[in-house]
Amino acid sequence: MNRTKSSKRWLQEHFDDVYVKKAQAEGYRSRAVYKLKEIDDKESLIKPGMTVVDLGAAPGGWTQYASEKMRGSGRLVALDILPMDALPNVEFILGDFREDNVLQELINLIPQRTLDLLLSDMAPNMSGSSAIDIPRAMYLVELAFDFAEKMLKPGGNMLVKIFHGSGFDELVKQARASFEKVVIRKPSASRSRSKETYLLAKGYNL
C-alpha cells in the first residue's frame, strides 16, 4: 500500500528532527522527554523522594526522565491505555484513565493528599478535525484536573498538556482559583504547527 504524501512528509520530518536524533543518542524512549526536561530545568518540579503520577505515559519518555531525577526514592506511578516496557522503580497501570475502574486502581495506589506532582501528556487519537479533537483533549485535561484536586497534597504541582481552543480559557481560570502560580509553556521541543501547550500549576491550595 502506498503511503500518502502527508505520512511520507511526517516520516521525513520525524527522522530529520533534532530531538528525535537527540533522544536516540541519549537513550530516551521519545523526543517528548525534552518538553518535560525544559520545563523541569526552569521550575525544579521533580525531586528525589516525591510521589509522582504520570498520565499518558507510553512509550515512557517522561516516566524515564522522572525516574532518573527521583534516583530510586519516592514513588512513581505511570498509566497509559497502551503497553509500556518496564522501567526501574516505576509502577505501571495499563488502562484507560477515563474508565472508573482504572481510575480507582490508581487511587488505591496513592493515599489521598500525598501526591507531590501530577504529570499528564495525555492526548486523544486525533481525527484532524479541531471540532472533534479539541473537546476530546479538553475532556482529558478536565479528568486530570479533577484527579489532581482529589489527590495533590497542599503545595503540590501539576503539569498537563492542553490544546488551544474552546474551553482553554475556562480551564486556565479554574486552575488559577486552585493554585498559587499558573503559567502556560510551549517548550521548544513542541512542534511549531502543533496547538499543544502545557499548563503548569504550582502550589495547590486546598
UniProtKB/Swiss-Prot annotation:
Catalytic reactions of this protein: uridine(2552) in 23S rRNA + S-adenosyl-L-methionine = 2'-O-methyluridine(2552) in 23S rRNA + S-adenosyl-L-homocysteine + H(+)
GO MF terms, alphabetically ordered: rRNA (uridine-2'-O-)-methyltransferase activity
Binding of S-adenosyl-L-methionine, residues: 60, 62, 80, 96, 121
E.C. number: 2.1.1.166
Subcellular location: Cytoplasm
Keywords: Cytoplasm, Methyltransferase, rRNA processing, S-adenosyl-L-methionine, Transferase
Active site: 161
Matches recorded under HAMAP family: RNA_methyltr_E (MF_01547)
Family (UniProt): Belongs to the class I-like SAM-binding methyltransferase superfamily. RNA methyltransferase RlmE family.
Protein name, entry field: Ribosomal RNA large subunit methyltransferase E
Gene name, Swiss-Prot/TrEMBL: rlmE
